[in-house]
Amino acid sequence: MREFEAHGATASPGVVTNFLGVRIPSDIMPSILKSLEGQKEGFPIPGNWHADIAEWAAALLSVREAKTSYRILEVGCGWGCWLSNMGVAAKARGLKIDLIGVEGDQQNIEHAKHTLALNGIEAHEFQLTNGVASARNGVALFPILDGPGEVWGAEPIFHPDAETISKARAAGSHTELKCYTLDDLSHGKPIDLLHVDIQGSELDFVKGNFDEISTLVKRILIGTHSRYLEGSLQKFLLDQGWALEMDRPAICTNVAGKPQIAVDGVLLFRSPTMPHPVF
């Protein structure tokens, strides 16, 4: 992480500047970022408002290992957080970048476009899709969010039947979006980092797209949302010969005798086709 610290970065009005020099508009999450507006954050130990040291280190390892170009596919990209951070880090190393994101909320897509442009990332260097990542093509119902920057954890309804779609239309509660597979989004190109944060459907996505993952993806970084999913993902990927590089378990609280997620977990796996990194 220290290798990527932007020592020359300075604070700018109206944005929060992080340790990579990435500028983040405060309006993407006003309840947290308004108070930090115009500041430059320090090194994130143990973390910052966005992620902890485990996720930062896991993601940056993929940039460190890249040679002449860098491609990230962020599934559930929100405001383009990992696209922006890894894109800036890769460009600082002189790498050609290709940033691919899919997100269910259109307002978050607009935030992502703004954040990427604010950080000098040009239109030909990124691809954003308003849709839902899935194991197969079809339709999903995505909740209409009240202030998406302040509401996370929205779960789509995958492949709903006609009655469910009709009820959602009548209630005005969801928007209908296309489902995209990994192959749809990547166009068959190799991926340095697949970042998956899709609120509980991460296991289905990984299993359903694993043929493409096994041939295209060098590393997969997963934000987990239950201990069950962590264990199931670990078993599946380890059984396929993938190497575990980061394991920071989800933190749960006990609510009425049931675990409730408080902090997402972090898993990083390396493809068996990739050599062990040299530090």
UniProtKB/Swiss-Prot annotation:
It comes from Jannaschia sp. (strain CCS1). GO terms for biological process: methylation. Keywords: Methyltransferase, Plasmid, Transferase. One of its GO terms (molecular function) is methyltransferase activity. Transmembrane segments: none annotated. It holds the Pfam family Methyltransf_21. InterPro entries: FkbM_mtfrase, SAM-dependent_MTases_sf. The keyword Methyltransferase applies. Gene3D superfamilies: Vaccinia Virus protein VP39 (3.40.50.150). Its EC number is 2.1.1.-. This is Putative methyltransferase Jann_4284.
